[in-house]
Amino acid sequence: MNNKTSVYDKENFFALYQKLRSNPISLNEIVEKPTMLSLLPDLQGKKLLDLGCGMGGHLQLYLERDAASVVGTDLSVKMLEQAEKDLQKCGQFSSRFSLYQLPMEKLSELPERDFDVITSSFAFHYIEDFPALLVMIANKLKPNGTLVFSQEHPITTCHKEGERWEKNEQKQQVAYR
């Protein structure tokens, strides 16, 4: 279904990203997650799709809020493996989630449809043809469905220097914290 590869599947990059996301005072934890959750409708009994679901953190939050089922897509095999592992730990969720390795540009190939809510957290900046993605999202949503997404402001990553960049052994910038 997919011939693209993800930078997150590189061992060092994935390890650095996991470290970054485990920070309890990160932008994701103190701003983005609470804001995203506040914008969502009541999730009880709803079917949700999370585009660029990463390690499944948002999927777990949706299931904890009584979503009937959640579907996550991501390009990264490593991210999806971690999501599967973490969601399986919560035994009561095991039959209520599905994960697909699929780039957002191929959303039309996702076999599932008729979602009440579609979300995406800090992932749309990877998309070249955003209008085409919005058409595919509209085709996957139920009538009057909801799209909620977050997007990094370019100012957060425009500075080339500074201590906020995670760097690999070659001193290349790989993630911003």
Regions found by a protein language model. Give the residues of each.
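Conserved class I S-adenosyl-L-methionine
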Residues: 1-43, 57-61, 82, 146-177
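A short, aliphatic-rich alpha-helical micro-motif
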Residues: 42-43, 112, 134
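Nucleotide donor/acceptor-binding cores
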Residues: 45-47
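Class I SAM-dependent methyltransferase SAM/SAH-binding core
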Residues: 49-51, 55-107
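A short acidic, Gly/Pro-enriched loop at the edge of an enzyme's catalytic core
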Residues: 109-118
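Short catalytic micro-motifs in class I SAM-dependent methyltransferases
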Residues: 122-125
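A short glycine-rich, Lys/Arg-flanked "PGG" loop and its adjoining helix->strand segment in the class I
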Residues: 131-146
